[in-house]
């Protein structure tokens, strides 16, 4: 079936003008597949945002040959991108004289649907929408289906994009299956679609008493709702198996709503298995386990038995899933963002203790496959990530633009960007579970994002706070003290006065919290940037490998510092966005290059050289090292990454480090934290 991308690609690759001026209000040109296709035709996109920065790049890299449009149909082309049609008229005269105007937008692709509603979708949902749109009947002589208003468009999207047919939700099984499809699949339901769905469900008397808004919008709340009702479901099975209950489990439920849920129904049960597997639901100690299992054997997945056996069983099931779901070479970046949290869950379980040899062999084999697959994917696709536009940022430098859009929606609500320096996804899984026990009223919206490679603080954290790519801060790329300047510059350029912006780093203890509290209480800050570096400090001092790392991170989280920091911010009305600048990985030493002063940066997982020639001399002595391309990096910044899970330290030494391109270093959490309203 044709794709919505086809007319865009056809227009941009048509023979003729080498310079095109494109209005792209919906960021369609930043779609991953569109970018890949354009790169295959040697077509470069150059956004026109800052006129001075644009002119510098244009003159240095693209101007030669553009004025005369010479070079033939197969010559490299440039697409200058602006946000709207009218902005093309404001481009410099030399571009207007030589360029051809084009325009692409969702309103052109889906003219029969309400544009504001369609625009709320993530680009990942456009394929499903286009397929459904093309299948709609047309009147004789018409190329488009009948026009739908806003409400009808919302219903259309709910049904055909999110597989939610409100008329088909008639009982608890239907409702629960719909909720589980959304939450387990990680689907983002736009706010106006969620509102439309809630309006319909709230009018249905069959769902009176269900906390529908929280169940639909808050995955963690939905999991707590299920967790509390799981023992009650086991009660019912145990009674059927002959047990006599002294005290029903319902007495311990806190979340309102129906007490009995149809966990065993055909559309629900497969999700329950997976939720226990992924750690979103926790097995419970149940006194009548034998009776419940006798009735329905599958419920054993949600009942504690022998802790060691439970752990081995869970590791085996995670291995089954991860072996099956390892992303292929043509996978989208979203596939890796979805894979990383499940790999993190396996890592947490794996490092809790020993396992049988056969299980260990499976783990190490899968990890080797993962390292090869992820590196191959990065080498092929990482270059297209930096400009991705999505409802959740694809890379850390896209976080400030994302926060700016969030602030436009709620301009009166202050925001805080909290960076837990060096926290990998597996460590977030530990911290998250501790937080859930300490502060059950927290509402966490979890996502993930890519760090910059090399995964070191001066590169990735500076990009994170400045909202720019490393090539734009080449003069300070070796500094760890420029985050505040980048953060201040971003927000002043986006409309905030300096006294409404704040930044504080190295937040570690109660005294630092007191300082922050006094600072926030004395000034009305609208955008606060914070760095807590305890986890990175643990990593750099770790001599016990990842098992020791996990143990100390758990101790740190249980100490309550992070919970207190979140309380401080949430009590003052902030919405908190928690992320990391990079992760970390357990690595084994292969020796340190005796390179004298030729390396500008001598890290444990990366060396930085001023030229490819100098890098090559070291690479020749360390087979398997990775000459990382300078994608998005400044000239004269040439990285050499350690191979796989190795490090440039004494041979055989085991450390926890970062700087390379392992999955655990590159993909980091991005979590929105709010306090759940009653």
What are these regions (language model features)?
Residues 1-415, 422-576, 580-678:
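…; additionally, a secondary subgroup of soluble metalloenzymes is captured
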């Amino acid at each position: 079936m044709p794709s919505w991308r086809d007319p865009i690609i056809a227009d941009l690759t048509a023979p003729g003008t080498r310079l095109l001026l494109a209005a792209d209000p919906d960021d369609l040109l930043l779609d991953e597949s569109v970018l890949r296709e354009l790169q295959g035709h040697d077509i470069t996109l150059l956004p026109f945002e800052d006129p001075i920065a644009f002119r510098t790049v244009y003159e240095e890299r693209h101007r030669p040959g553009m004025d005369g449009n010479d070079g033939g149909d197969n010559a490299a082309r440039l697409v200058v991108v602006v946000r709207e049609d009218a902005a093309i008229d404001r481009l410099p005269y030399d571009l207007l004289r030589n360029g051809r105007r084009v325009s692409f937008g969702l309103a052109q692709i889906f003219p029969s649907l309400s544009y504001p509603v369609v625009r709320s979708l993530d680009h990942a949902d456009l394929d499903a929408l286009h397929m459904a749109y093309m299948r709609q009947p047309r009147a004789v002589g018409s190329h488009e289906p009948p026009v739908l208003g806003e409400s009808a468009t919302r219903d259309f999207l709910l049904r055909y994009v999110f597989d939610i047919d409100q008329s088909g939700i008639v009982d608890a099984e239907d409702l629960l299956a719909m909720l589980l499809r959304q939450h387990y699949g990680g689907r983002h339901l736009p706010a106006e679609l969620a509102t439309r769905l809630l309006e319909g469900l709230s009018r249905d008397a069959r769902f009176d008493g269900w906390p529908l808004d929280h169940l639909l919008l808050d995955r963690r709340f939905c999991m707590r709702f299920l967790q509390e009702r799981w023992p009650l479901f086991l009660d019912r099975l145990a009674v059927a198996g002959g047990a006599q209950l002294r005290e029903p489990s319902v007495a311990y439920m806190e979340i309102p709503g129906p007490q009995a849920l149809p966990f065993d129904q055909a559309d629900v049960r497969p999700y329950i298995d997976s939720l226990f597997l992924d750690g979103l639901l926790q097995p419970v100690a149940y006194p009548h386990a034998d009776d419940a299992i006798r009735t329905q054997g599958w419920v054993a997945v949600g009942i504690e038995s022998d802790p060691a056996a439970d752990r081995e069983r869970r590791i085996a099931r995670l291995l089954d899933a991860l072996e099956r779901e390892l992303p292929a070479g043509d996978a989208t970046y979203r596939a890796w963002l979805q894979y990383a949290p499940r790999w993190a869950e396996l890592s947490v379980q794996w490092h809790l203790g020993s396992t049988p040899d056969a299980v260990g062999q499976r783990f190490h084999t899968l990890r080797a496959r993962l390292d090869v697959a992820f590196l191959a994917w990065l080498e092929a696709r990482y270059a297209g990530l930096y400009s991705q536009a999505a409802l959740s940022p694809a890379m850390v430098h896209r976080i400030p633009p994302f926060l700016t859009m969030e602030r436009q929606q709620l301009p009166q609500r202050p925001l805080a960007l909290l960076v837990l320096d060096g926290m990998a996804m597996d460590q977030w899984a530990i911290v998250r579970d501790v937080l859930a026990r300490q502060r059950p009223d927290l509402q966490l919206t979890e996502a993930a994002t890519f760090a910059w490679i090399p995964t070191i603080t001066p590169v990735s954290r500076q990009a994170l706070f400045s909202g720019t790519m490393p090539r734009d801060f080449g003069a300070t790329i070796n500094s760890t003290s420029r985050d505040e300047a980048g953060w201040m510059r971003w927000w002043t350029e986006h409309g905030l006065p300096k006294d409404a912006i704040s930044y504080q780093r190295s937040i570690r203890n109660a005294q630092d919290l007191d300082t922050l509290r006094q600072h926030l209480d004395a000034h009305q800050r609208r955008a606060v940037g914070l760095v807590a570096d305890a986890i990175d400090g643990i990593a750099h001092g770790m001599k016990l490998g990842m098992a020791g790392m996990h143990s100390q991170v758990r101790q740190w989280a249980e100490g309550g510092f992070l919970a207190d920091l979140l309380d401080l911010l949430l009590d003052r009305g902030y919405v908190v966005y928690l992320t990391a600048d990079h992760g970390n990985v357990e690595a084994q030493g292969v020796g340190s290059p005796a390179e004298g002063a030729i390396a500008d940066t001598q890290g444990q997982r990366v060396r930085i050289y001023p030229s490819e020639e100098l890098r090559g001399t070291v690479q020749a002595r360390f087979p398997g090292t990775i000459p990382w391309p300078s994608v998005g990096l400044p000239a004269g910044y040439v990285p050499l990454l350690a191979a796989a899970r190795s490090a440039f330290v004494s041979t055989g030494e085991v450390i926890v480090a970062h700087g390379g391109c392992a999955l655990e270093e590159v993909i980091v959490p991005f979590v929105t934290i709010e306090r759940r309203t009653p």
